[in-house]
Amino acid sequence: MAAMTFHLDVVSAEKKLFSGLVETIQVTGSEGELGIFHGHTPLLTAITPGMVRIVKQHGHEEIIYVSGGIVEVQPGSATVLADTAIRGEDLDAAKAEEAKRKAEENIQNQHGDINFAQAASDLAKAIAQLRVIELTKRSR
């Protein structure tokens, strides 16, 4: 029996990263991890820095980093509108490690000119990128 599929678009302000039929997606929503399958109840929710794990037709997997945005689920389709979206294999581990180090330093050494909320957001994004890099390496 063939797996049930639905259409998925993953787009950012810069470009469309993915468009096609998928069996399932996993995305980090504002309330936690979401698993979306064919026939999912319609939904519109914010997504936080993290990954979109896509299981394409025939079980092939792709992982995309998103810095935030929204996911909309409709009967037969889903759309991820991301602030920034980068394929896992296109992420730079050295840059992500450096961004993580800088954010941690800014949080620890708070000065009047450092915005704690911005530093925490930068840290969350860097950690999410490193997680996507690790998962991409494992899925190869």
Swiss-Prot record:
The entry lists its GO molecular-function terms as: ATP binding; proton-transporting ATP synthase activity, rotational mechanism
Q: Which domain of life is it from?
A: Bacteria
Keywords in alphabetical order, please: ATP synthesis, Cell inner membrane, Cell membrane, CF(1), Hydrogen ion transport, Ion transport, Membrane, Transport
Bilayer topology: Peripheral membrane protein
Phosphoprotein in keyword set: no
State the Pfam families in the record: ATP-synt_DE, ATP-synt_DE_N
GO CC, any one term = plasma membrane
Q: What is its main location?
A: membrane
Q: Which InterPro entries match?
A: ATP_F1_dsu/esu_C_sf, ATP_synth_F1_dsu/esu, ATP_synth_F1_dsu/esu_N, ATP_synth_F1_esu_C, ATPsynth_dsu/esu_N
**Leader sequence residues:** none
User: Where is the protein found, in the record's own terms?
Assistant: Cell inner membrane
Which PANTHER family does UniProt cross-reference here?
ATP SYNTHASE DELTA/EPSILON CHAIN, ATP SYNTHASE EPSILON CHAIN, CHLOROPLASTIC
The protein's assembly and partners: F-type ATPases have 2 components, CF(1) - the catalytic core - and CF(0) - the membrane proton channel. CF(1) has five subunits: alpha(3), beta(3), gamma(1), delta(1), epsilon(1). CF(0) has three main subunits: a, b and c.
Give the family from UniProt.
Belongs to the ATPase epsilon chain family.
**UniProt xrefs under NCBIfam families:** ATP_synt_epsi, PRK00571.1-4
Role summary? Produces ATP from ADP in the presence of a proton gradient across the membrane.
What is the name listed in the Swiss-Prot or TrEMBL entry for this protein?
ATP synthase epsilon chain
